[in-house]
Amino acid sequence: MKKENSKTITWIILVLIGFMLLKSCNTKEITEEEPKKSKDTFTIISSTSTSALDDEIKKYGKEHKINIEIEHYGDLEIVDILNNNSKDYDAVWISNSIWLYMLENQNIITDSKSIVIDPVVMAVEKSKAQELGFINKEIKNKEILEAIKNGKLKYVMSSVTQTNTGATAYLNFLNSLAGNPEVLTSEMLKKDTLQKDLKEFFKGVERVSGDEDYLTEMYLKGNYNAMINYESSLIELNKKLVKENKEPLYLIYPTDGVAINDMPFAYINNDSKNTDKKEKFDKIQNYLRSDEITKLLEQKGYRSWFGGIKKDTDSNTFNKEWGIDTTKYLKDMKYPSKTVITEAINLYIEMLRKPTHVVFCLDVSGSMYGEGLKELKEAMTYILDYETASKDNLQFSDKDKITIITFSSNVEDIYPTKLGSETKEVIKQINELETVGATNIYDPSIEALKILENESNDYTKTVILMTDGSSNNGSFKDLKKYYENTSKTLPIYSITFGSSSERQLNEIADLTNGKIFDGKQGLKKAFKEVRSYN
């Protein structure tokens, strides 16, 4: 008996030691994954549009013994982050000063100075621009609108509600069609003629991207002939098009107003007593405004001058054959107040934007049982519920259509909605879902394409596919055959989750000029991101 007790005690001790070692390992892993920032670290929250200078900034920091960290986000996302917690950052580099004015606590932002200038313009394939009479001619925004109204011009752009280029292009067009008033007011937004013109403008949208970088990638892979983007991005795109022996774009600078981004670098004054941080900021800002960086940025297609005339520019970058004339003055638009900008964005969502028909294909196979299905239900409720989605400007409007397809080994059920804002019933149906069977991502994708093929071209049409596993039923060949014979331009966006197959989803993305979003770090975040692409 004593011998048995002794064995039992020994076994318990070994288990406890093992548990303690495991706990120690886990603690170490957590520490390594989430290191605390040193107080000496100078952290910059920066627009994704500035990432081309990361290496130069960090190199400067190393040479001057400043430990610089840079975190990149979309411009409108930066506003949300700083509104919720600015204390994690020491400086902000954003595309346009208007977003600094949208902050709830503007007092923490000081010493803001423009680094470079980057207009947002429409660019059209040169042959199409020639056909429209846009070459070597002074063009007004109204003439662009007329080309769209007459069905002669369609274009792709970034999200108005989630990106800087989309928002500023919209505000510029709105301001111009309102007659370029000294101050754009709330009353002006209510004018029927203005709203009618803006609806016509957005009817020309062929596809929307949730970020500017993907917009360029999407254009290169797709069959489009016009785009709204940064001048610098369009210059880089044209260089790629020429390299691929494709037709470059012709940039159009309306004489009645262009959205100009001043790309300010500003200090975040979290602690006025911390003079060390301020000194580091001053050094970095002065470096960004130095002749060395100015020259480098000009080579990348950014302007270092605001309007006016500059003759000594690189003709390979600021190419006159692409419609770029650096000797002409650019008329900047007058941005309205914070209140009017907010009202204008809401007007766009509810009244102006081209309606969308989104088909969600949701995996309810057996591997989604438990936490996976629970997270899916929460994410879909967030996206579909008007009140919660509107907090992030992601809500569907009455004009939109939503279709839900659930699948496992086959297509399980299809839940359509007629009004995008009336989703209570479909949310209820989603929350009653149960898991069953294996995984087949191809058949529901084909079914989604069939639904959208029958939809009017008055809608932007998108498929969003969410899966947590490898497809062991259905065939990519069947999907490819159907797509190439019918759809051709409809994108399928995929959200990965669990052990989903990157290879299979990449095949679908390549076929449909789509994109893959990572849902493994949270489905809600992934659905929020993909929502901005439609």
Q: What residues fall within each predicted segment?
A:
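Acidic, polar low-complexity linker/tail segments
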Residues: 8, 26-30, 305-359, 366-374
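N-terminal segment of the mature folded domain
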Residues: 33-159
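A bilobed periplasmic-binding-protein/Venus flytrap-type ligand-binding module shared by bacterial periplasmic
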Residues: 121-128, 261-279, 296-300
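Ligand-binding pocket segment of bilobal, Venus flytrap-like solute-binding proteins
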Residues: 181-253
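Periplasmic-binding protein-like
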Residues: 285-309
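Von Willebrand factor
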Residues: 351-416, 418-466, 494-504, 525-526
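VWA/integrin I-like adhesion module and closely mimicked acidic/polar interface patches used
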Residues: 375, 432-435, 467-518, 528-530
